[in-house]
């Protein structure tokens, strides 16, 4: 039995304000808003729901896992070449298609020449190092360069030669799932009094 919910722009803006007011710390995942709306809708008919959030990461279903087989070849491309490609792609108007060639080239080039365990997260980031530097003030950047931030975010004990699906799965399980996906589904559902498993 399927149910359909439609939301108008006023409901979306009101929900955005509710989510913003309830968040006690930043969460950089914009999908919290549709997850909040879905949880609100589900709460009208159920008290407990099952979620598929995290399944692709757990079972290695996303593109970063498929790319693990190619990391050893991508590691041969120097970082400065990756920076040139990234800068060039940022100047070319983007296409709206999800996973378009423009999108893929721009994001993959961000990781070129960096340690393997950083590449995947650099690909996934909505911002290049240049974007990050442009957004933050010079005093902050002088103390915390984007490279230093990446080094601090990713655990130092992760082997710099990480290139296997198993290692990527460990990284996702230790960092991405608990700090993004699972936090998002937990907050969005609990804000509506819905238990999600």
Regions from the PLM with identified roles:
Residues 1-148, 184-197:
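ATP-dependent adenylate-handling active sites, centered on carboxylate activation for C-N bond formation
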Residues 177:
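Globin-like tetrapyrrole-binding proteins
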Residues 28, 32, 159-172:
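Structural motif
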Residues 148-157:
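A short, charged helix-loop
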